């Protein structure tokens, strides 16, 4: 009974902090990326169960829950991407590119919630849970494969293989954003057509 939705949300934030700490400590030993992966599991636990607990107990607070849940989601997303950029795995500019793509999709989700009363968690087949699983897989590959040593010189700049993977992920996020925007813009233009202007 002592566990509340707010405490689960806070646990999710702690998980994101652990991810960032694990990423930084990976400069000492790459096995600290396991701490980062544990942080993602903890983040998933808190983020997935806070709303579920409220529904089971019938203590939903739609306005407060939406406010707390999604403002802290933005914070945890920033912490996770900072952890990526501060780790030996990925350049900070690549991590920020992923952050920009993810936040664009998040903002798009919130706009659609208000405009068309549809809350989308998944784009394509990619949702928050799939993103966490992808990050855990990337951490594991970095620890146990020689891929971390693969680097390319592109236009005079050094790019690691995981930087290229990060850029690919960012491109996919922006592709989902542009694709869904194009589709919804057409539908909304028909639903809310332009009014004729008479000077």
Residues of each region from the PLM?
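Hydrophobic alpha-helical transmembrane segments
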Residues: 1-37, 83-199
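Acidic (Asp/Glu-rich) catalytic motifs at the cytosolic membrane interface
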Residues: 32-82, 108-112, 182-186
